[in-house]
């Protein structure tokens, strides 16, 4: 499917998906409080976004257990994480950013670049499997 045919997710939705994936990947509960801490937002603001993500088919909310990504949610989260890692690697290897600079810059760029650009950057980098932080 072409980039232009995909639903454009807001940076906020992408950050939530990435945050939920990160929490559940480590084996932690993706509770509203854990998610609020991970994203640096107030717990009260989490509820509305969880409902939105559930409506979009990206998460399932399990009462008293927290949030789990659906298959589609996991696919999107991994796509976003891949974008971030390719950007970090490109910024460091090709543009001379320091290790401490790449994360914040990649956080800004990951929401603004196309899948096509990420694919081309990854190709130039010989499809890296790890980011500059070793992840």
Model-derived features: where do they sit?
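Anionic-ligand-binding alpha/beta catalytic cores of soluble enzymes and soluble regulatory domains
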Residues: 95-135
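Basic, amphipathic "hinge/linker" alpha-helix immediately C-terminal to the N-terminal HTH DNA-binding motif
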Residues: 65-84
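Extreme N-terminal segment that seeds HTH/winged-HTH DNA-binding domains in transcriptional regulators
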Residues: 1-40
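Short, hydrophobic-biased segments on the C-terminal half of alpha helices
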Residues: 50-51
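A short, conserved structural fragment
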Residues: 54-62
């Amino acid at each position: 499917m072409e980039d232009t045919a995909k639903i454009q997710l807001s940076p906020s939705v992408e950050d939530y998906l990435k945050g939920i994936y990160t929490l559940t990947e480590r084996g932690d509960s993706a509770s509203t409080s854990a998610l609020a801490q991970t994203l640096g937002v107030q717990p009260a603001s989490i509820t509305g976004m969880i409902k939105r993500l559930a409506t979009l088919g990206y998460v399932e909310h399990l009462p008293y257990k927290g949030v789990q990504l659906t298959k589609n949610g996991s696919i999107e989260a991994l796509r976003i994480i891949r974008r971030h890692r390719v950007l970090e690697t490109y910024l460091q290897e090709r543009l001379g950013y320091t290790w401490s600079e790449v994360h914040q810059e990649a956080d800004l760029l990951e929401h603004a670049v196309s899948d096509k650009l990420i694919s081309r950057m990854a190709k130039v980098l010989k499809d890296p499997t790890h980011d500059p932080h070793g992840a």
